[in-house]
Regions:
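Extended, Lys/Arg-enriched charged tracts that mediate electrostatic binding to polyanionic substrates
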Residues: 9-19, 23, 67-104
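P-loop NTPase catalytic core of nucleic-acid-dependent motor ATPases
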Residues: 29-53, 98, 103-147
């Protein structure tokens, strides 16, 4: 039999009076691709340099069950998430460049989409049929000695 919170349509992490931070964290991590390593969160977009959007997302999910001290609850959840999402080994991938529309491999292949968590992602799109950067190549020719 389901508990009262589930029957009322409330989340499993809310008992009607308080928020179970561990259950909230568990549910949040199941629905969001996020890990914590080397002192930072990482998502399919790359390193999270500002936790404010993450905190805002947590707030959006918590506000249906508004209880006292929401900012402290959010801080506790973020700290708990650091433990729950901790990954010890997250090595760089030197054979690829993650771009806003996919991943470019050094062998020239391109895979569209953002299927996995990455260390960084450049905010530019890969365009395989883009025209040659004539002006840039002229600039480089002026800097470098001919081969």
């Amino acid at each position: 039999m389901k508990n009262k919170a589930q029957l009322d349509g409330m989340p499993v992490w809310f008992d009607g009076k308080s928020i179970n931070e561990a259950l909230f964290c568990e549910e949040f991590l199941q629905t969001h691709k996020i890990i914590f390593t080397n002192g930072a969160f990482f998502t399919p977009e790359g390193r999270v340099t500002d936790e404010l959007p993450l905190r805002g997302e947590i707030f959006e999910e918590l506000k249906c069950c508004a209880v006292s001290n929401i900012p402290r609850k959010i801080s506790n959840i973020v700290e708990l998430m650091k433990l729950a999402a901790l990954v010890e080994d997250f090595p760089p991938e030197p054979d690829r460049i993650h771009l806003s529309n996919g991943t470019l491999f050094l062998d020239g292949t391109f895979v569209e989409g953002k299927p996995k968590i990455v260390r960084n992602r450049f905010p530019v799109s890969y365009k395989p049929n883009a025209p040659k950067p004539v002006l840039w190549l002229q600039f480089l020719d002026g800097l470098l000695y001919p081969e």
